[in-house]
From Swiss-Prot:
Record GO biological process: carnitine biosynthetic process
UniProt source species: Caenorhabditis elegans
Classification of source organism: Eukaryota, Metazoa, Ecdysozoa, Nematoda, Chromadorea
Protein's name according to its UniProt entry: Probable gamma-butyrobetaine dioxygenase
Known catalytic reactions: 4-(trimethylamino)butanoate + 2-oxoglutarate + O2 = carnitine + succinate + CO2
Cofactor comment text: Binds 1 Fe(2+) ion per subunit.
Length: 421
């Protein structure tokens, strides 16, 4: 379903005026009454035909019936014409299938329209809006926990903020009540299980399996689980009991830092985007599963570049955790010194005041952030007597979070909604 506003805008200028082709390149040219034109590959029109023999469309599933093994990619049209009464393009194919393409359908999907292509790329919920302290301080998006739990528009807006800024906060859950993480997780979708379980607790422990549990001192900036080949993409923490003093949350946008290094320290940027680091994590954690205490032993090992680029050279992942960094460097010994200099410079940039966001989670607050974009830490703290600083948390993957955003855009008929087929 498209938003009513988008449909109305398109309909106002979507009267089909003419159709020509297919030409020798198997292209069909369409013109609308507003002067806009469309260039449609003939085979694409057959493949995307919105008819029951081509697609199964139901509340439970949208899927193409055609199989590529049997699909004739050279098939032709017997005839094509504009049905003026229905304002649609009709094509009768050699196979006997009749396709009907409404004017709005064609305009939204017009492969030769740069605006249509730009709009479609937004379905991936990129690009991010990177930030330093000046851009995010005082502008961090915060939402009511109560409204999040009962209003799907707030769920959408909260998750959309995380997609854009990489972070957002829920305020005011019932204080000291366990189960908030699970309840929020149910509103978002499926929580991602790790070797720390489905939902974990962060507090000081004598037999700590993680640096966050081992000391009340400050921690270094890091992303979680660089020791995994596929680290969780988002992390959430809920404050059950805050510290009497200290324990502030600190975040830095790794994408923003990477772009600073690209401009200011290109030699450092090159090392961090080409040299993989090895991370290890050995130990055990204890889980309660179906009323039984289960010890899970693990020996994790993975390699990541600190800054990963996509095919277009854009930063799309940050992965760094000094506590889990191993001794192994898969490069010539003469290059190791430069690798250390690069890690040092990256870390110093993270700690520059211009890059850091600092705030305090109060009891009942929850923060969700992009674990492969933002680095996080906390400063040292002091507990009140008999009131240990305690958080619960979990992880998510982007597929679940972004699926929820797209689903709600469809369900709520929001302006940003886009067709699935």
């Amino acid at each position: 379903m498209l938003s009513a506003l988008l449909i109305r805008n398109i309909r106002n200028a979507s009267k089909l005026a003419s159709v020509a082709g297919p030409n020798s390149d198997r292209i069909v040219n369409v013109k609308w009454s507003d002067g806009k034109t469309g260039v449609f590959p003939l085979i694409w029109l057959r493949d995307t035909s919105p008819d029951p023999s081509t697609y199964t469309i139901s509340p439970a599933m949208t899927a193409r019936k055609l199989t590529m093994l049997e699909f004739d990619v050279e098939q032709n049209a017997r005839k094509l014409w504009i049905d003026e009464d229905a304002n649609c393009l009709k094509i009768e194919w050699e196979s006997g299938v009749l396709s009907e393409f409404p004017s709005e359908w064609l305009k939204i999907r017009n492969p030769s329209d740069q605006e249509a292509r730009r709009r479609r790329r937004k379905v991936y919920l990129f690009p991010e809006q990177t930030w330093g302290k000046a851009e995010i301080e005082g502008k961090l998006k915060k939402f009511s926990h109560e409204e999040f739990m009962k209003n799907e528009q707030v769920v959408h807006d909260f998750l959309q903020a995380v997609c854009i800024d990489g972070i957002a906060v829920l305020k005011g859950a019932p204080q000291g009540v366990r189960g908030a993480v699970e309840a929020i997780g149910d509103r978002i979708g499926m929580i991602k299980r790790t070797h720390f379980g489905l939902v974990f607790e962060v507090s000081l422990k004598a037999d700590a399996s993680n640096m966050a549990y081992a000391s009340n001192g400050g921690l270094p900036f890091h992303t979680d689980f660089p020791s995994l080949s596929h680290p969780p993409q988002l992390q959430m923490l809920h404050m059950l009991q805050s510290a009497e003093e200290g324990g502030h949350s600190l975040f830095v946008d790794g994408f923003h830092v990477a772009e600073q290094l690209r401009v200011e320290k290109p030699e450092i940027f090159k090392i961090l985007t080409t040299q993989s680091m090895e991370y290890i994590e050995e130990g055990y954690d204890v889980h309660e599963i179906n009323g039984k205490t289960i010890r899970f032993d693990y020996d994790m090992c993975a390699r990541h570049k600190v800054i990963r680029l996509n095919d277009d050279g854009k930063v799309n992942k940050i992965q760094f955790g000094n506590a889990m960094r191993s001794w192994f460097y898969d490069c010539e010994p003469s290059k190791v010194q430069d690798v250390y200099r690069a890690m040092k410079t990256f870390t110093e940039y993270c700690y520059q005041p211009r890059n850091m966001l600092k705030f305090r989670l109060e009891d009942g607050d929850t923060v969700l952030w992009a674990n492969q974009r933002l680095l996080h830490t906390r400063d040292g703290f002091r507990n009140a007597p008999e009131k240990a600083r305690t958080l619960t948390g979990c992880y998510f993957d982007w597929d679940i979070v972004k699926s929820r955003v797209r689903f709600l855009r469809d369900k709520l008929s929001l302006e940003q909604n886009q067709p699935s087929a």
